[in-house]
Amino acid sequence: VVLISGNHEAAHKMPRALELPDNVRRLATRKPESVDGREIGVRVQDCDVLFHGQGFASATVDENVVQRYPLGRSGAFNIGLLHTSLEATGGEHARYAPCSVSDLVSRQYDYWALGHIHKARVIQAEPPIVFPGNIQGRHIREAGPKGCQLVTVDDRNRPSLEFVPLDVFRWHELTVAADGAKRGDDVLGLIGQSLHRLVRDQGELPLAVRVVVTGCCPAHRTLAAAPEAWANQVRAAAAGAGEVWVEKVKFQTAEVEVAAV
């Protein structure tokens, strides 16, 4: 295992105090470091593997460090590790060790494994530049499957990617269209049906679900008059759907517009 520290590890004392197992190699934070895979028993198709990376000791890094990374070594399979926001300047994840895709490509590596962004994204296919994301969703903004990328290298040193789920608990936002529903109980029935379908289709893991009810319906006033009471009924209905926890219920319905006579 080769790892680098990012902003979360730099900001907290506990990860720095943990004693790592003998098979784990943590890369330096002062400057980029290269590790020959032979030192840790790693080879690919009888080809040498080199890991290039730098961890960070600070929770805030504004510097582009990529140009300090060494060029990839010819004849070896070169893997780059970097904790970075790329060129992003806003959104959920703060700007961190910013760089461009062209900066990464200039190092002539065969694979870039990036951290910091929690959503899995393949930024570029050739050479692969990949955010595997985090391995467990922590809240509704991290919905969907979470895991890692399994990288297989063929006899021509060409990598192929396969996403492997690792999460043990999955978040999901469930939108239920209640258009035309006349009564609150009708809406409950629609939600119950949707929850059962969700568990049937994605129920290999326990689910945490945010239910969003939309649409124009006569039941709107009934729902709007006591939203928390109806939300509790949704939670009770979910108990019969399987391993589902309803995190929140949001009623975004509207009254039916009556055409002027």
Regions found by a protein language model. Give the residues of each.
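His/Asp/Glu-rich metal-coordinating catalytic cores
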Residues: V1-S160
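Accessory, non-catalytic peripheral segments of nucleic-acid enzymes
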Residues: L166-V261
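Catalytic core of bacterial cyclic-dinucleotide metallophosphodiesterases
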Residues: F163
